[in-house]
Amino acid sequence: MELTREKVLLLTFLRMQYSHILPDSIENRVISTEAPEWELDKSLQDLLIHDYDYSKTSFSSSPPIVANDTVSNVRKPSDTKQVNGAGGQVNHSRAEDSDYATSDLSESSDVGDDDNSCIFSFSKVPMQKDVASIKEEERLDPKISTLNNIDAIANLKLTNMVESSQAVNLTSSKQSSINQQSSVSTDYDDLRSISEESFHLSQGEIPLTFPMNSSLTDTEADAVVAVDALFPGKQRGTHNTVNKARSVSNAKAPTSALRALLEHKENSSQNGPLAENFATFSGHAESNALRLNIYFPSSESPSKPLFVELRKNVLVSEAIGYILLQYVNQQLVPPIEDEAQNPNYWNLRIVEDDGELDEDFPALDRVGPLSKFGFDAFALVKATPAQIKENQAAYPFKSKHPTSIPEANNKTHIRHTSSTSSQSQKQAQDVKDTLNTSHVVQVRLPPYGDNARFCNIEISKTTRLAMVLNQVCWMKQLERFKYTLRVAGSDTVLPLDKTFSSLDGNPTLELVKKKVRDKKGSTQQLPTSSPQNSVYGSIKKDAQSSTYNATDIMSSNTYQEFLVWKRQPVSFMGRHERLLAIDGEYVHIMPSESKNIFETPKTSSIHAGSIILCKQSKKSPCNFKMIVSKNRETKRYDFEVLSALEAAIIVSRIRALMNTVKKIN
């Protein structure tokens, strides 16, 4: 490193003791000394060669600067007397009294000339004060002590806020972190402004006041009282101000009856029946949770979905309850009435890719698992009055909290009723209780015999037999469209649209395959207790009106073949050429003759009874989809053809086959 005159001059000055401090302000204090000779700085050159680091030296009462023996006219740090110019004013000063030194070169001269002197001016280089000097100043001037206490309070608050901000969770969002940092920065600016204003208290320029909504601690209040005592004649915060601020911060805001009612309603929604029954179905803590987008066609934003996370094995009815809970908690618009906060009032439907409701697909089976449908987007729609009545009868749910009604004064309000009306009301209540009473029905599973298995289902008298069949097939992992119900020990097949109250007593039911029913073709009648809900006519009518059978379809020339492309977005190719064949009751998806190396020769045969939906796309008429129920789950097939007309023909043929098989079964 090259040693220049300027570097030697600066280093020589830093190794000197402070002397000749002028009595000016902090920013204008000047330190003067005589410049050393160039030839006498060999020791300084050696010091620079060894790279001496002054920044690592700890400060005590004065900077660690030792005067060089080669430098002349250098005074030790002690009380000095200095005569300022022609005025002859004598000033006493110490090196420790300097808060700042300056670093501005005001005058320069030839370093080699001994007669010339150099004056340096340094600005805002902080030096550490002696603790003894600070205590001495506070003892002589109580005002300084009070101001230092206020600064200490501000610094303590700032330290606490910084420590609390460091404890913020690292996984919080970026916006949350920015808000917390801005809050800390705002509080810091407020405290620094209070600290800066405190320096002007001695001049009476700024009154010391605290906002009325701020919360003062005991230490802060004592500091305000101390400042008021120091400056009694000027406009300051008085004891009454502190006491008033304390009373305002400790007092409770008045609460109106309307606000209390709204808070009670909000707490009721968070702790109501929805939260009690469906909050446990959240899949937020599970890795394999169902992550769905739920659309609300009746809301103000029907195209904006609500993201929910559900457990993997949740049922459709349970998913509806949890979705309603999230709708209420997030306060979406319009709000749902208390009576409608009931899963029986709603249905879950499948939507298109753009979120529009798929009108061709019916409401999802409430007793089945939601995961079997294989979709990630659904729509929550209002059920019809008939569906609400049916769901409420099968699965009663109370959507309201029991409200406390003041009891009437029997002494002043007496209601006379006749014996006839009271008796009729009692009979109606007994009938209602009987219908709502739960029963356990036994369903025998094939194969039948002495070692036959049974499945117990808890139902009510108003439960439809279709719900019983759905629940049995769900519990035993069976395909619902292949089975039906009959009374045990008979060949009478039960219509699934009737209720359990249409049966006499509590008979044992049997689960039977539909093909067995078709072979026997029984039309036996079942005795019932209610003529209105009798199943005689329905069974005989179905047997007489059913002119289709499986042999007619199989014997007819119904084989058709179409060239389609199966769309697979996840695949490397994007789409694969396939042959879609309609043969009897089955739809076959076969590989085409022009196979490539990425395809495997695999044929999928789908029964028409397992096809849930077949629909042509509205946005892309050349595309159509087919949804199939298989092994308690649903699978979706997306196909593409050359023209919209060909897609319409395929969809119409598959739908006709679905209707034919449905009439037979």
UniProtKB/Swiss-Prot annotation:
Residues 558-659 form the SIN1-type PH domain. The keyword Phosphoprotein applies. GO terms for cellular component: cytoplasm; cytosol; plasma membrane; TORC2 complex. Keywords: Cell cycle, Meiosis, Phosphoprotein, Stress response. Residues 65-112, 395-433, 517-537 are annotated as: Disordered. One of its GO terms (biological process) is meiotic cell cycle. This is Target of rapamycin complex 2 subunit sin1. It comes from Schizosaccharomyces pombe (strain 972 / ATCC 24843).
